[in-house]
Design a protein with these regions (language model features):
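Jelly-roll (double-stranded beta-helix
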Residues: 1-317
Length: 317
């Protein structure tokens, strides 16, 4: 169960767009995220696998980490690594992660918090489970999303936002059947706390068993829904969906999900497409091959930062 919950009867309501005659988005595609490993071997689902980049724009990459109940000494993280040219959005649904970067940032991401890092011109950072989770094991569930930056912003100064759970906008659908945790962007005039370089909306929704959730959505944005857990249907034609499915919607003013016999947990994404060339390799997302090569050269020369002398390291026991 997500760490952040609320009584939907007490929350601000999102208007049902059907009452306003909104055009509902049909389903364009449904894909299944394959399982793999990241960093030093922690399990992930590659949420965007097999989806055309034009359907994802301005999003680049997304991994679901867990949900997993780790045995002792099973948790793994990632050691220090560079990024340039995009933003990483790390959302910890349950559990705890430690992080640190070469610009003096660092801290703990836990139980509903989001770490929003704008890599911009370049940064080194590390994300790893704390010693207590490694030694004792325990529940861990999270997501990491990569958001592209337009060419004019790729070399901006790196920055970091720590979005604690109490900052997230908690909303309910008109019938109170769904909880929406608005992390960034806007839904029906309500705003999330995340400051974005690219116009986007990011939210985590819980649709209660048997309930239908229809959300208004910016018609200038694409619309993606990733199933974190549960099963149900998507769109006006009730396409079946389950854990690991990514739903891409066509154009329109709203979209719909309906939960099955258990709660349907959804990570909802949409943004204004950048529509610029993308040159990506490993931790760098630029516009040209020459810019990619420059990023590698700058990293090798230490121009993306250095690991602090007392820098965080993965705990291996």
């Amino acid at each position: 169960m997500p760490a952040v919950t609320a009584d939907t009867l007490t929350l601000p309501r999102i208007i049902d767009p059907r009452a306003l005659g909104a055009s509902e988005r049909s389903v364009k595609s449904i894909t299944m995220a394959p399982q793999g490993h990241e960093g030093e071997g922690f399990p992930v689902r590659r949420a965007f696998w097999g989806v055309p980049t034009a359907d994802l724009d301005p999003f680049i990459h997304m991994d679901q980490m867990g949900e997993v109940d780790y045995a002792p000494y099973e948790p793994r993280g990632t050691d220090w690594h560079p990024h340039r040219g995009f933003e990483t959005v790390t959302y910890i649904i349950d559990g705890t992660f430690l992080h640190q970067d070469s610009h003096g940032g660092g801290g703990t991401i836990a139980n509903g918090a989001t770490q929003w890092m704008t890599a911009g011109s370049g940064i080194l950072h590390i994300e790893t489970p704390p010693e207590a989770l490694v030694v004792k094991g325990g529940l861990f569930h999270g997501l990491q999303l990569w958001v592209n930056l337009p060419a004019r912003s790729k070399m901006i100064e790196p920055r970091y936002q720590n979005l604690e759970p109490n900052l997230v906008s908690l909303l309910a659908t008109a019938d109170a059947g769904s909880l929406v945790r608005l992390i960034a962007g806007e839904i029906d005039g309500h705003s999330g706390p995340g400051g974005t370089q690219t116009p986007i909306t990011v939210a985590h929704a819980t649709v209660q068993p048997g309930e239908r959730m229809t959300l208004p959505w910016n018609p200038a944005y694409n619309a993606l829904g990733y199933v974190l857990a549960g099963d149900g249907t998507a769109g006006p034609d009730a396409h079946p969906v389950s854990t690991g499915n990514l739903v891409v919607f066509n154009s329109g003013d709203s979209f719909t999900f309906t939960a099955g016999t258990s709660a349907l947990e959804l990570y909802l994404l949409g943004g204004q497409p950048i529509r610029e060339p993308v040159a990506q390799y490993g931790p760098f997302v630029m516009n040209t091959r020459e810019e990619l090569q420059q990023a590698f050269d700058d990293f090798q020369a230490g121009r993306l930062g250095t690991v602090p002398a007392d820098g965080l390291r993965p705990f291996r026991g």
